[in-house]
């Protein structure tokens, strides 16, 4: 079975919330794709409920694209503690952390239900499982802790 980097990470050593560069892969023509760990809550101590996580996912899909070039995808971890962010090229963890912080601030402060994309039966595969209230509450809690650009040392941006 292939070795997956995420499953070799010592989850007891990280200090969430943080942004971590997992890997930079280079394609046959030299194109680079970077994978980031956007860890919002401490592993094995908490998990974001699916309704809130789902709403944060839909909002980050747009908000991160507004703030970073080359966003390919932002997908939640099955453990519900954060997201994978996949981008063309490379960004520093500080740059990604600033974009994430700004996005979470917008969710917390200004987003209304009408702003949440993909919440109908035609536009979402599980449209009933959303909660903007839960998303806002978790964004508030995450931002109160501060987002670090280092997974092992608290270097809050």
From Swiss-Prot:
Gene Ontology biological process terms in this record: quorum sensing
Residue sites binding Fe cation per the record: 54, 58, 124
Catalysed reaction, written as an equation: S-(5-deoxy-D-ribos-5-yl)-L-homocysteine = (S)-4,5-dihydroxypentane-2,3-dione + L-homocysteine
Cofactor requirements of the protein: Fe cation
Disulfide cysteine pairs (residue numbers): none
Pfam families registered for this protein in UniProt: LuxS
Cofactor binding summary note: Binds 1 Fe cation per subunit.
SUPFAM superfamilies linked to this entry: LuxS/MPP-like metallohydrolase
Coiled coil: none
Swiss-Prot/TrEMBL keywords: Autoinducer synthesis, Iron, Lyase, Metal-binding, Quorum sensing
This protein's record includes keyword Iron: yes
One Gene Ontology term of the molecular function aspect: S-ribosylhomocysteine lyase activity
InterPro entries per the UniProt record, alphabetical: LuxS_sf (IPR037005), Metalloenz_LuxS/M16 (IPR011249), S-ribosylhomocysteinase (IPR003815)
EC nos: 4.4.1.21
HAMAP family: LuxS
Subunit structure: Homodimer.
Known function: Involved in the synthesis of autoinducer 2 (AI-2) which is secreted by bacteria and is used to communicate both the cell density and the metabolic potential of the environment. The regulation of gene expression in response to changes in cell density is called quorum sensing. Catalyzes the transformation of S-ribosylhomocysteine (RHC) to homocysteine (HC) and 4,5-dihydroxy-2,3-pentadione (DPD).
Family matches, as PANTHER family: S-RIBOSYLHOMOCYSTEINE LYASE (PTHR35799:SF1)
Protein family according to the UniProt entry: Belongs to the LuxS family.
Protein's UniProt name: S-ribosylhomocysteine lyase
Natural source organism: Lactobacillus acidophilus (strain ATCC 700396 / NCK56 / N2 / NCFM)
Encoding gene (name): luxS
């Amino acid at each position: 079975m292939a070795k997956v980097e995420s499953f070799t990470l010592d989850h007891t050593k990280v200090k969430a919330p943080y942004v971590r560069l997992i890997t930079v892969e280079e394609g046959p023509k030299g194109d680079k794709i970077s994978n980031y760990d956007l860890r919002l809550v401490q592993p094995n101590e908490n998990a974001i409920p699916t309704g809130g996580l789902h709403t944060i996912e839909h909002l980050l899909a747009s908000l991160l694209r507004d703030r970073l070039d080359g966003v390919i995808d932002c997908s939640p971890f099955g453990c519900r503690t954060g997201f994978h962010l996949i981008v063309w090229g490379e960004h520093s963890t500080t740059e990604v952390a600033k974009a994430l912080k700004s996005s979470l601030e917008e969710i917390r402060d200004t987003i209304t239900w009408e702003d949440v994309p993909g919440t109908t039966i035609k536009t979402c595969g599980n449209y009933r499982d959303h909660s903007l209230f839960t998303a806002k509450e978790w964004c508030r809690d995450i931002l109160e802790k501060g987002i670090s650009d280092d997974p092992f040392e608290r270097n809050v941006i």
